[in-house]
């Protein structure tokens, strides 16, 4: 290799390195969150804990029923939010019941023999009431109180930001023994728009008085974590069952296998910027 070519290569390499060093890094360090908001259903409260009761009522179909119930519940929230400017909005409790009735009807039509003259209520009314009562007081995940207590010790305001209507959330929090551990319990019901509508996520900013970028939002629902990330929150996806994340080109800020991963947002020893 001649000297002129060598000099040219060296010059180009230096120039390239110099230019690279002047390009700003878009991945700026994230500020320590000043508040933490949690999704409720699926994140703090185990929506599939109803599967045991469902299995007792519908032997051999409890797991399938609980999965279909949850999927249809979420589908209904999206349907009433996006259709006809929300004119068909119904409270979350009503949508939860409607989704359960659908799930039972689908399983009954394909798998369960019933009397041809009997109405749905005669055949399944008691089962609907039992499962809805179970949903009022869903099992909480075991690490909830530990994590919320630690955040409280750090002086970090916490809250729920949920599709659930106020009465549902109040009872769920009380049943889980989390009274006094949450600064805010925020329902989308007053705005009549369910997540993932941006107005639903804006409620977190309004309640805390903080911009989304200074709030950590925690959800076990990948679609919820994705939409919250798009909105501007720092996010934690709690991936308890080792599922893939949504394939839409955006990842959550953090991923963990339990609620304890939210504590990774805060240095140790804790440094509270509030």
Predicted regions and their residues:
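A metal-dependent, Asp-based hydrolase signature
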Residues: 57, 63, 76-130
């Amino acid at each position: 290799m001649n000297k002129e070519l060598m000099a040219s290569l060296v010059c180009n390499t230096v120039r390239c390195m110099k230019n690279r060093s002047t390009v700003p890094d878009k991945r700026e360090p994230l500020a320590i969150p000043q508040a933490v908001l949690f999704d409720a259903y699926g994140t703090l409260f185990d929506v599939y804990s109803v599967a045991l009761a469902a299995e007792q009522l519908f032997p051999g179909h409890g797991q399938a029923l609980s999965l279909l119930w949850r999927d249809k519940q979420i589908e209904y929230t999206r349907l009433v939010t996006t259709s006809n400017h929300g004119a068909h909005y119904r409270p979350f409790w009503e949508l939860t019941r409607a989704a359960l009735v659908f799930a039972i009807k689908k399983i009954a039509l394909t798998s369960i023999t019933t009397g041809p003259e009997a109405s749905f209520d005669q055949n399944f009314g008691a089962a609907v009431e039992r499962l809805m009562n179970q949903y009022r007081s869903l099992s909480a995940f075991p690490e909830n109180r530990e994590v919320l207590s630690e955040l409280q010790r750090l002086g970090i305001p916490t809250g729920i930001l949920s599709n659930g209507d106020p009465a549902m959330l109040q009872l769920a929090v009380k049943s889980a023994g989390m009274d006094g551990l949450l600064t805010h319990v925020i329902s989308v019901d007053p705005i009549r728009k369910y997540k993932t509508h941006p107005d639903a996520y804006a409620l977190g900013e309004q309640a805390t008085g903080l911009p989304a970028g200074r709030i950590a939002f925690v959800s076990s629902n990948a679609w919820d974590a994705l939409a919250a990330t798009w909105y501007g929150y720092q996010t934690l996806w709690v991936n308890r069952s080792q599922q893939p994340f949504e394939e839409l080109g955006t990842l959550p800020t953090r991923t963990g296998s339990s609620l304890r991963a939210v504590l990774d947002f805060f240095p140790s020893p804790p440094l509270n910027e509030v």
